[in-house]
Amino acid sequence: MKLIFIHGSGGSKEAWRYQVEHFPSAEAIDLPGHPRGKPCTSVDGYVEWLRNYIHERGYSKVILAGNSLGGGIVLLYALKYPGDLKGIITIGSGARLRVHPMYLTQLEEAIKNAKLLEEFLEKRWELIAPELKEVMRRRAFENGPVVFLNDYLCCDKFDIIARLGEIRVPTLAICGSQDIMTRPNTPTTLPATSGEQER
């Protein structure tokens, strides 16, 4: 069995530092373009990249865990390639990941003025442990606002609500009561609509 953690928009594998320390066989990955390589322009593109990554390494009985954009990748992977998986975990994510236009505008402005990216991130990272926050901040600036905007646009286009009932792999959905992007009382945070699904 292999447990793989997938970060959210503009993020990095460092976001999963404590989880990787806790689960010895776990692995956290950087999505392409974060910062090496070229970012994918859709959730589906990230799914195909991830499948190649998994198959190249010969992993089997994989459990995928993803936050935000990473959760969307996990859900779509479960729909497309359920035979690769032992289970999935979504954290602060959902089957539809609409992004408020204000956030997209802020990121467009941050491309012109890097200082605005710091302001954009600071509001979202208030609850992160200080020692981890600094590492994530450094990695976020390595990725840059163009990658953040790309990932948020991927999220904004993502919508698989109509297909949730097709997911047949064991599923755990986790939501935070103080998550400012994905509210726990939003129906789309549930990765399954069928009563046969594990939640």
PLM regions with names:
Residues M1-K38, V43:
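Conserved HGGG/HGGXW glycine-rich cap/lid loop of the alpha/beta-hydrolase fold
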Residues G45-V62:
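Conserved acidic catalytic loop of the alpha/beta-hydrolase fold
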Residues G66-G70, V74:
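Gly/Ala-rich beta-loop-alpha elbow adjacent to hydrolase catalytic centers
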Residues L75, L79-K80, L85-K115, C154:
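Flexible "cap/lid" loop of the alpha/beta hydrolase fold
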Residues R98-P101, K115-E166:
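Conserved alpha/beta-hydrolase catalytic His-Asp/Glu region
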Residues I167, A173-C175, D179:
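Short beta-strand/loop motif that positions the catalytic acidic residue
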Residues I180-T186:
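Conserved alpha/beta-hydrolase "acid-adjacent" motif
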Residues P187-R199:
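Catalytic histidine neighborhood in serine/cysteine hydrolases
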